[in-house]
Design a protein with these regions (language model features):
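N-terminal nicking endonuclease/strand-transfer module with a His-rich metal-binding environment
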Residues: 1-311
Length: 311
């Protein structure tokens, strides 16, 4: 049976680049550069967001996740513990990836349509199936019940990669409106392991009707006593996580390259401006020297020299 996948990564806030990756806010050039990294821009339009109340909407690229976080906290009167710090210290964001075995997730997303997953293929004719929307809404409801709907900053479904999945961004805020990673998601070693096991168990109940069985996780399988199939499943999860991490870093590099190009253009413009000003200054100095020489030679009066300098 197909397996479910859950991966949770803590971060001390979120950068604009990370937000752009989650929300698919890319320039056309950046998206095209990612074709070789399991991204298909011709399927970008299939992605969607699940928002409050379980509503399916297009991905809102106009409000970044850091902006959403700031607005959310301000409305609730909660202070970001990393605000004002030279370097962020507190884990205020949980990035959760939810999905399952590739073939089953593709069936939910695309049904029996003939999707070409080769790099450079044109899949603009593909439509999104209702199955992935129903799974996403049930998964959103599960996360909302588990962590509080008010703590969900983004719940984005990506259908432009090799394996359809959810990127969910939540804040670990407790019932007292305080950030507490340990209370919500972590704790000491055994406590953290137990919470993750419970999360897997509860998510498996949601996934039953979608043909996804409870998956194994690193905390439970460890490095020993794995069957070949368990080891393959663990490797798939690790490869998927590392693939996403690498893609994120490539995206950051791509964006930095664009910023460097813009900066180089600005520097070139400023250099030209400085050169022009220096040339003008030198011409004026030459003109002053010429006027002073004419005055010393008696060809012009002091008044004439001053008047010409004023011009």
């Amino acid at each position: 049976m197909a397996k479910q996948v859950i991966d949770i990564m803590p971060t001390k806030g979120m950068t604009a680049a990370q937000s752009n990756e989650h929300l698919r806010k890319y320039s056309e050039g950046a998206y095209q550069n990612m074709r070789s990294n399991n991204f298909d821009p011709t399927r970008a339009h299939l992605g969607f967001e699940v928002t409050k109340g379980g509503k399916i909407v297009p991905i809102d690229v106009n409000r970044s996740i850091p902006e959403r976080m700031k607005e959310n906290l301000a409305a609730r009167g909660i202070k970001d513990p990393n605000e004002g710090l030279a370097e962020p210290m507190y884990r205020t964001i949980a990035n959760i990836i939810l999905g399952g075995s590739r073939e089953q997730m593709r069936r939910l997303a695309f049904g029996n349509q003939d999707v070409n997953f080769n790099i450079g293929a044109d899949n603009s004719h593909i439509i999104r199936e209702k199955g992935i929307e129903e799974w996403a809404k049930d998964t959103y409801d599960f996360i909302a019940r588990k962590f509080g709907e008010e703590n969900i900053l983004a719940f984005v479904v990506h259908l432009d990669e090799t394996n359809p999945h959810v990127h969910c961004t939540i804040m670990p805020i407790n019932s007292k409106n305080k950030f507490s990673w340990n209370q919500i998601l972590g704790g000491q070693r055994d406590a953290g392991k137990k919470k993750f096991q419970e999360l897997h168990d509860e998510f498996a109940e949601v996934n039953k009707k979608y043909g996804l069985d409870r998956g194994d996780n690193i905390h439970e399988t460890g490095a020993k006593h794995r069957t070949t199939e368990e080891y393959k499943q663990w490797l798939w999860g690790e490869c998927n996580r590392l693939e996403k991490e690498a893609d994120g870093k490539r995206m950051v590099i791509c964006m930095l390259d664009e910023e460097i190009s813009r900066a180089e253009i600005k520097i070139k413009g400023l250099t030209t401006m400085i050169n022009n000003l220096n040339e003008k200054k030198n011409n004026l100095l030459k003109e002053v020297d010429s006027l002073e020489q004419q005055y010393r030679n008696g060809t012009i009066t002091i008044e004439e020299m001053n008047n010409k300098q004023k011009r």
